UniProtKB/Swiss-Prot annotation:
GO CC field: cytoplasm
Function of the protein: Catalyzes the reversible phosphorylation of UMP to UDP.
Family: Belongs to the UMP kinase family.
Stated regulation of activity: Allosterically activated by GTP. Inhibited by UTP.
Domain of life: Bacteria
Biochemical pathway: Pyrimidine metabolism; CTP biosynthesis via de novo pathway; UDP from UMP (UMPK route): step 1/1
Name of the protein described by the UniProt record: Uridylate kinase
Subunit structure: Homohexamer.
Length: 231
């Protein structure tokens, strides 16, 4: 089974942190390694919130601020590749925005070859264009690696009808469609990512990635998190 895991940059630094937290990064490696050992084919899209905050770039023109964010995802991807390989895993980085020794251009034959080798695919540089989020990039790259599942790795155990941090009476919604999520105004993903999921028939699973073992449970179809399906 092929799956694309969407990680926030904050996953690498810890909440409110900057840069890289070795303990958090080792946790990520172990969770991904467990999935690889069970035979799952893994792709990753990572954000850059551990390196750049939106508020820090607010005085720049939007296109240039987005370019800085895209480059941040490349930095995170190179970091992850090194850590994965030091842990005995194979990993390859694909991007359309840079030419670095460790970064390959997106090539479908190369992607298939890497998956046969059980390499982790790390997709850097978002969609390569400004104005698109890493959520949209995750769906696009899932399609390119022929995965029909995107796991959004968050610190919340699923989708709620309102923010559970602000509202103690928030109710978890274990299963819903993209149309329902959009109608309810739920911020699971941005509208462009939702639309692409609907068009491509890709399912999104929202989990609390930082509950040990939850990723593997989600991949095995166990009842964790929330599942958002095409209509």
């Amino acid at each position: 089974m092929r799956v694309l895991v969407k990680l926030s940059g904050e996953a690498l630094s810890g909440e409110g942190g900057r840069g890289f937290d070795p303990e958090r990064v080792n946790y990520i490696v172990n969770e991904i390694k467990s999935a690889i050992e069970e035979g799952f084919k893994i792709g990753i899209v990572v954000g850059a919130g551990n390196l750049f905050r939106g508020v820090e770039l607010k005085n720049l023109t939007m296109t240039r601020a987005d370019q800085i964010g895209l480059l941040g995802t490349v930095m995170n991807s190179v970091y992850l590749k090194d850590i994965f390989e030091r842990s005995g895993l194979k990993a390859r980085i694909y991007s359309q925005i840079v030419n670095l020794p460790d970064v390959e251009r997106v090539n479908y034959d190369s992607i298939e070859s890497a998956l046969r080798e059980n390499s982790i695919l790390i997709f850097a540089g978002g969609t390569s264009n400004p104005f698109f989020t890493t959520d949209t990039a995750a769906v696009l790259r899932a399609q390119e690696m022929r995965a029909k599942l995107v796991v959004k790795a968050t610190k919340v155990d699923g989708v709620y009808d309102k923010d559970p941090k602000k509202f103690p009476d928030a109710k978890k919604i274990p299963h819903l469609t993209f149309s329902e999520a959009m109608k309810m105004g739920l911020k699971v993903m941005d509208a462009e990512a939702f639309a692409l999921c609907k068009k491509l028939g890709i399912t999104v699973k929202v989990i609390n990635f930082f509950e040990p073992g939850t990723l593997l449970k989600a991949l095995k179809g166990e009842d964790v998190g929330s599942t958002v399906v095409p209509d």
